[in-house]
């Protein structure tokens, strides 16, 4: 193989790293030490939460007999391969068990198998540690979300030592992605498999929706790369280790491209751009990566977010469908990415809404999705790969026991959007958006490197009533409590 050397790869400490050998804990050993949600009157939510952790711990494994993986990891639970984007979302909830098992070290195995030009394959066999794709295949890598995952972890625990280690491979991968996944104008491309959304009908009909780039500008990939610039810049603000002027320039360029080229003013939506310079006019969930990238100008935000409120589009029985319901190929039972509600993309929408201050609708969507997932859990006893958008049932093309990334719903969405508790280590506080009126909270909540908190809100007669909050912490902490347009600061 021919490679162009990438100077950041030379700083990648995971390549050739001595394997970490730890005893893998069992759920039975650790269940009493996990965070314990309180949600009076909703025992089924707690049962679903417990099931998610039990299944997740059952998917932790040591490296198989090979010299390539360097850390214990949580399996993707799909096809015997470790997936880049599945892992990034699995760790969004795995972080809450940090002090019991480091789910985050799953990504170590991807960093350890980085090629010397910066490439990382999106899918690597768990037993042999082999790439499933050649690097110039449009489906070989992506989505590029690992920097978001690492920053999310840092925001919860402030682990600067890990940030120092992961910066180089993340930066190297961004450089590779920019050199190998852009058109001549600096816009980005992928494929159905490369973007992780296999069969969304977004390409011109002569191209294969799974494997072809279709000579198209991909809205999700452009927004993800803009977002990735931002997270790498934030990391460098902490680490002060790099010249990131190229990232600043690229972020500004992608922001301009997204808003001048991929926006349709009439429909107030961001679209993919076909090779004939026509917007494809397919409203799909990939567009909403623009929220997390902070690409949506304030004057466009209300009209854009309105699509998530429209029952003819994305506001269905379940949230959030991957294809707008007014598309002729929308399937009310799912058909994989032609309508199904998926845990990772719905979580992305919630995070993007929250990043833009749209907290009320983030709560509404999160509450709806969690309610449906718990309802289906009650009916089937398991968590599914995806869910039907128009019915409280599994998607018609979905796998059971998918924990896997579906664990993000009864854990992270439950904690962060329904219970409303979000960690902000960089601000040295927790923000608690109190939307519920029943007694609720979390016991044994991990925050930062040393904090363990018990957080309890007593029952209220209405959403306007001031929450009565009890906080117990082993270290001093600030809790910003927000409710009904008001807020108060608690120091414990």
Locate each region found by the language model.
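Aromatic-rich carbohydrate-recognition surfaces in CAZymes
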Residues: 10-11, 80-193, 219-222, 226, ...
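Alpha-helical scaffold segments in soluble metabolic enzymes
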Residues: 176, 231-234, 303, 413
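Structural helix-adjacent loops and short alpha-helical linkers that scaffold large soluble proteins
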Residues: 36-46, 94-107, 153-171, 234-252, ...
């Amino acid at each position: 193989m021919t490679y162009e050397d990438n100077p950041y790869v030379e700083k990648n400490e995971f390549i050739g790293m001595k394997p970490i050998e730890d005893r893998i804990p069992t759920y039975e050993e650790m269940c009493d030490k996990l965070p314990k949600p309180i949600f009076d009157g909703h025992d089924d939510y707690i049962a679903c939460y417990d099931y998610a952790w039990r299944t997740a711990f059952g998917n932790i494994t040591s490296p198989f007999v090979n010299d390539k993986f360097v850390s214990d990891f949580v399996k993707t639970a799909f096809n015997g391969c470790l997936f880049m984007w599945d892992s990034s979302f699995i760790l969004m909830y795995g972080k809450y068990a940090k002090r019991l098992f480091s789910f985050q070290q799953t990504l170590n195995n991807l960093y350890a198998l980085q090629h010397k030009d910066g490439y990382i394959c999106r899918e690597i066999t768990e037993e042999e540690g082999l790439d499933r794709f050649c690097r110039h295949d449009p489906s070989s890598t992506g989505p590029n979300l690992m920097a978001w995952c690492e920053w999310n972890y840092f925001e919860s625990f402030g682990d600067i030592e890990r940030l120092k280690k992961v910066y180089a491979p993340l930066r190297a991968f961004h450089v590779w992605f920019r050199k190998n996944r852009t058109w001549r104008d600096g816009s980005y491309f992928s494929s159905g498999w490369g973007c992780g959304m296999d069969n969304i009908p977004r390409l011109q009909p002569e191209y294969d929706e799974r494997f072809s780039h279709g000579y198209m500008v991909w809205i999700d990939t452009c927004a993800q790369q803009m977002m990735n610039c931002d997270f790498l810049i934030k990391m460098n603000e902490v680490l002060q280790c790099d010249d990131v002027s190229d990232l600043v320039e690229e972020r500004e360029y992608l922001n301009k491209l997204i808003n001048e080229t991929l926006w349709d003013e009439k429909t107030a939506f961001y679209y993919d751009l076909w090779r004939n310079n026509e917007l494809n006019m397919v409203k799909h969930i990939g567009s909403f990566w623009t929220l997390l990238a902070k690409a949506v100008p304030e004057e466009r935000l209300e009209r854009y977010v309105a699509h998530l409120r429209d029952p003819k589009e994305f506001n269905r029985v379940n949230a959030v469908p991957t294809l707008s319901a007014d598309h002729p190929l929308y399937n009310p039972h799912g058909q994989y990415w032609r309508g199904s509600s998926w845990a990772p993309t719905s979580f992305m929408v919630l995070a993007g809404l929250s990043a833009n201050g749209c907290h009320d609708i983030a709560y509404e969507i999160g509450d709806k999705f969690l309610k449906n997932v718990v309802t289906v859990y009650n009916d089937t006893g398991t968590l599914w790969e995806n869910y039907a958008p128009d019915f409280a049932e599994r998607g018609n093309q979905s796998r059971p026991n998918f924990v896997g990334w579906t664990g993000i719903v009864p854990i992270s969405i439950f904690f962060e959007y329904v219970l409303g508790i979000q960690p902000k280590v960089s601000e040295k506080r927790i923000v608690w958006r109190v939307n519920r009126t029943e007694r609720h909270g979390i016991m044994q909540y991990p925050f930062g490197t040393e904090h363990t908190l018990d957080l309890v809100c007593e029952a209220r007669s209405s959403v306007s009533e001031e929450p009565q909050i009890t906080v117990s912490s082993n270290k001093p902490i600030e809790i910003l409590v927000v409710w009904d347009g008001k807020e108060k600061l608690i120091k414990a």
